[in-house]
Amino acid sequence: PLIVEIMAHSSTQDTVSSESVQATAGANIPPADSQARVSAFMKRIQDSICQRLEELDSEHQFLEDSWERPEGGGGRSRVVKQGNLLEQGGVNFSEIWGDRLPPSILAQRPEAAGHRFYATGTSMVLHPRNPYIPTVHLNYRYFEAGPVWWFGGGIDLTPYYPFEEDAAHFHRTLKQTCDAHHSDYYPTFKKWCDEYFYLKHRQETRGVGGIFFDYQDGRGQLYRGPAEEGPAAQYSNQIGELPTRSWEDIFAFVQDCGDAFLPSYVPIIERRRDTEYGDRQRDFQLYRRGRYVEFNLVYDRGTIFGLQTNGRTESILMSLPPLVRWEYCFEPEPDTHESKLYDVFLKPQEWADWIESSA
């Protein structure tokens, strides 16, 4: 649920100074048609993703559940179940508006007071059936209240079996997209993604990461997260504040990120979907899916906030896989594909720089 995502992230964001916030007022204002344009984009990427996935598995179509928010807004939830390609997947669009801003946002952006707010976004989680195809997660969102606005989101990949060429292709596609807008976007947002999708109690990343960003309004430093001593913050501090980028600049970047999903992921599907697997691979996939559940229920701010504030439970938990298993003190056998996942793929790597001959 979008308002859950916005409020949860705003309640933990504490690194944007009041000076930079005040500088937003009166400058870099969104265009008059900003909301309509972002809404159209969010719907378009939902449509294009669903259409391409249905082409890849023509026997199983997404079922749409449209809903309306009495206070203003609504959305389209699309879910596929028990497909040949996707065991379960969801691609959701939502947009909401209203007069009452969440206190957590007003505390961070006081100049938003007195303005109506608007928020929209598209989110997606795909759980493939074949263990050799990675799970993938995408989320892009936009918030606006008068002179205050920002974009956030990202995309990350969670493989169950280690294929360097897949991780490299995914990251290179994202890096190429980011580099077309600014050379510091990818290194910052890649590090931010590794930081966010980390299971502290397991001391491992959720997968091979991707990119993650929030509070991007074209001003100040790129990193706006809570880990002030982490690699993303260190890199962001090193490059300093970037020149002001316009609303159009940031929107163009987010559009390109959304459009990069299919070329980043579909080639992996096509490369792995016909690979045969047995009980061993299926059992390991279900075991590793447990990490996805653990992250969402223990660390994901949107999930936690939604459950604590009586949000729509079915929507909040829709990202969870349909089947999962846990095993006490599981250890992969040495020198296996499963152990390689732990040794290499669940630690931050510079996948965009991977060279095949080094594998």
What are these regions (language model features)?
Residues 281-325:
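C-terminal, helix-dominated tail/subdomain
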Residues 71-97, 194-235, 290-297, 305:
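Aromatic/basic-lined ligand-recognition segments
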Residues 77-153:
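Internal mixed beta-strand/loop scaffold within catalytic domains of large alpha/beta enzymes
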Residues 30-109, 239-278, 282-292:
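Gly/Pro-rich turn-and-neighbor structural signature
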Residues 1-6:
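Short, Lys/Arg-enriched N-terminal segments with co-localized hydrophobic residues
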Residues 104-106, 222-224, 304-310, 328:
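Short conserved micro-motifs at the rims of enzyme active sites and ligand-binding pockets
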Residues 149-275:
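Long, contiguous internal "core" modules enriched in hydrophobic/ aromatic residues
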Residues 18-21, 26, 309-359:
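TerminUS-proximal long segments
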